[in-house]
């Protein structure tokens, strides 16, 4: 939320927010000016806004008296009308009593986003509203006043809150809260140690180099494999070699049919990746961060098959057969495909759920 300040001060706040990765701004006064600052989604009670706002200057913020009969709610009727007109709708509700809690639930069944404001969530726990909206297709945004409030709200993320909104007061506050949200959204994968059971040089195939917009450090790479539910940690080209200069932004990922883990615990085929797509960078501890594809390079190269076993499950991947291509061993050291041998211990990720269109589902699918 933009502060009630002169435009020049507000502009600096919004610019800092955009640089910190914040992409939504709620503002009622300077829609046209904000549009010129960058690619940002503006939430406002204007027909031209990216997201149409209901609730401010209405029942949501207490400007209008809320009837006990929610069917008579002006905010609810306005939200329904906006949805019929094809707008993306955000509802704003200050939770001051049980009646406004019910208004939030009703609006949540209509709106695409709902902003919830409360001075004390111990009076009406946020979890109550989340539980009531569990089956609704709405993103729940909790309003916070400061960094401590953001930390508290972020702890609730796992229970159903989709984000936070705050009024910008200073530049450090913006950066700290933005970083909190980024850190909370990171997934950590439980990497296992598998035993190599087969190493087989093959002929040539089309392999993909994923060049990202980030510089990776030693120990970082991507989760890649022939099976969507069992992936090797393939190391980045962040190490120096006597044969070629390092390319810390690159993962020589494997052939076109291989899967790669991307944000949201989804997988994609390497052949699908294009500039601008998101991918996950993973380190030896399973910690992740999001990066963007700057370029995907497909070239004909000799391949090598690597098979490993974990708790009776066979894991396979194909990689380019070159000394500079590495996976990661059990001691978190890069292991060149030129040096891999049967019996080596390597880092893998294995999940029990199958995947449908890259999304994990509880279903039996056999891959071999």
Swiss-Prot record:
HAMAP family: Arch_DHQ_synthase. This is 3-dehydroquinate synthase. Keywords: Amino-acid biosynthesis, Aromatic amino acid biosynthesis, NAD, Oxidoreductase. It catalyses: 2-amino-2,3,7-trideoxy-D-lyxo-hept-6-ulosonate + NAD(+) + H2O = 3-dehydroquinate + NH4(+) + NADH + H(+). Its EC number is 1.4.1.24. GO terms for molecular function: 3-dehydroquinate synthase activity; dehydroquinate synthase activity; NAD binding. It is an enzyme of class 1 (oxidoreductase). Catalyzes the oxidative deamination and cyclization of 2-amino-3,7-dideoxy-D-threo-hept-6-ulosonic acid (ADH) to yield 3-dehydroquinate (DHQ), which is fed into the canonical shikimic pathway of aromatic amino acid biosynthesis. It comes from the Archaea. GO terms for biological process: amino acid biosynthetic process; aromatic amino acid family biosynthetic process. Belongs to the archaeal-type DHQ synthase family.
């Amino acid at each position: 939320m933009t502060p009630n300040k002169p435009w020049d001060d507000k502009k600096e706040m919004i610019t800092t927010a955009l640089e910190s990765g914040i992409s939504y701004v709620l503002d009622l006064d300077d829609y046209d000016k904000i549009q010129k600052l960058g690619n940002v989604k503006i939430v406002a009670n204007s027909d031209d806004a990216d997201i149409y706002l209901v609730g401010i200057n209405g029942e949501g913020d207490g400007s209008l008296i809320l009837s006990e009969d929610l069917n008579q709610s002006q905010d609810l009727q306005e939200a329904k009308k906006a949805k019929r007109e094809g707008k993306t709708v955000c509802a704003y509700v200050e939770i001051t009593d049980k009646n406004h809690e019910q208004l939030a639930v009703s609006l949540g069944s209509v709106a695409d986003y709902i902003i919830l404001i409360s001075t004390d969530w111990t009076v009406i726990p946020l979890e109550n509203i989340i539980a009531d909206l569990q089956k609704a297709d709405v993103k729940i945004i909790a309003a916070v006043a400061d960094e401590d409030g953001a930390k508290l709200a972020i702890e609730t993320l796992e229970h159903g809150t989709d984000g936070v909104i705050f009024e910008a007061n200073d530049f450090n506050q913006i950066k700290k809260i933005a970083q909190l949200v980024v850190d909370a959204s990171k997934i950590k994968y439980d990497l296992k140690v598998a035993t190599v059971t087969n190493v087989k040089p093959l002929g040539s195939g089309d392999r993909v180099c994923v060049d990202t917009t980030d510089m990776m450090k030693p120990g970082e790479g991507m989760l890649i494999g022939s099976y969507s539910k069992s992936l090797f940690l393939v190391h980045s080209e962040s190490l120096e070699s006597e044969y070629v200069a390092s390319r810390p932004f690159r993962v020589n990922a494997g052939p076109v049919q291989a899967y790669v883990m991307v944000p949201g615990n989804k997988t994609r085929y390497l052949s699908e990746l294009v500039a601008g797509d998101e991918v996950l960078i993973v380190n030896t501890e399973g910690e992740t961060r999001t990066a963007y594809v700057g370029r995907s390079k497909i070239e004909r190269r000799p391949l090598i098959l690597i098979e490993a076993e974990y708790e009776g499950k066979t894991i396979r991947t194909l990689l380019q057969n070159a000394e500079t291509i590495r996976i990661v061993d059990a001691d978190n050291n890069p292991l060149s495909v030129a040096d891999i041998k049967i019996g080596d211990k390597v880092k893998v990720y294995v999940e029990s759920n199958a995947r449908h269109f890259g999304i994990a589902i509880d279903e039996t699918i056999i891959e071999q």
